[in-house]
């Protein structure tokens, strides 16, 4: 193949050459370009088992592989290296060193199941596997919290127990499709499927039912909710959605182009929004119902370079060699500049005013990419986490604070399932309690008063009270939507 054309009209071209190496001999792509201006040169060195790809901007990325074709190293366009280490016999990934130098290590059982993941911080996540079904039996996160899984005689997931030993149970039909879900509270949900494996009916814990109907081509034709309201869907000959008719008679219409991409939308009020697209499907212009236009410009590699809004004001964007946004300029000339680390996480944001001057915010991160400190011209804020990446403490100090002055501190604690249990500040402690479904049921305030939340069904908020006083009550319809608040 030397050329193919997408439905939108964009053409893609390829050049080839014959290569013979120590592992194989084959035709390989040596060049690639598109109508919109993308250009790539592919340089193969089969003796070294390497491939380098250079685009028209002069950016080059390279891969190296071993005799089995497994990638052993990757160098990105910024020159940053990522390396991979594989086992000799099973060819399992044993380790990876990321572009920042962080080392990841992987351990497997004798069947090749991943049992341990060690991250650059030394944290370990573990998995034990079912000996017959080769599905996880126990998963333990880096903080030691465990999720346990049970299976039936056909290998279907039968029950899940969370770190608080709260159990969710699943029932199946003869096709292995879930037909019943029993939550930790004992509430049941029921599902019914057709012979094509499509959901036909859902009955929630309150007995409310939603039904789905399909046409002979298995396309969704109608949805009838628990209030007996039906929404209907229509399609063109290619299966693209063209119309949605709601229960009250309102209609939305959609017009796709030959490639199935939306180019026109008509609202129930008859207001029309149009989109003009290029050969690759990118929106070039959007025109709303009042005739106002928003325009989008891209470079040859699909990066948004200019956005011109309805008032004719333009926002401009610049990128680095890794396609990361590095600068944004608004219509008034104000600039925002971004810096990144080797893991592509933002490490600096510089705000530039239209009259000059800059404000810099620095962001420090650990080897796992978590934000550990934010430095502004006025303050330094530190963040501390537990092994499961839950935020434990925020500590903020003014740069001009007196020697020995106390910083502002907020502390958090959690249960093993990740529910927030307490929030502590200088003003006191908020303490929270939850039901078996993870819904917050109580918040005790620093003055000793307790805010309580009452639910029904699978967690629909019904009442909030403070002591003996009702703060608010909620009335809901059969779809559990709030219809009245008092």
What label would you give each PLM region?
Residues 1-486:
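Extended charged/polar low-complexity repeat regions
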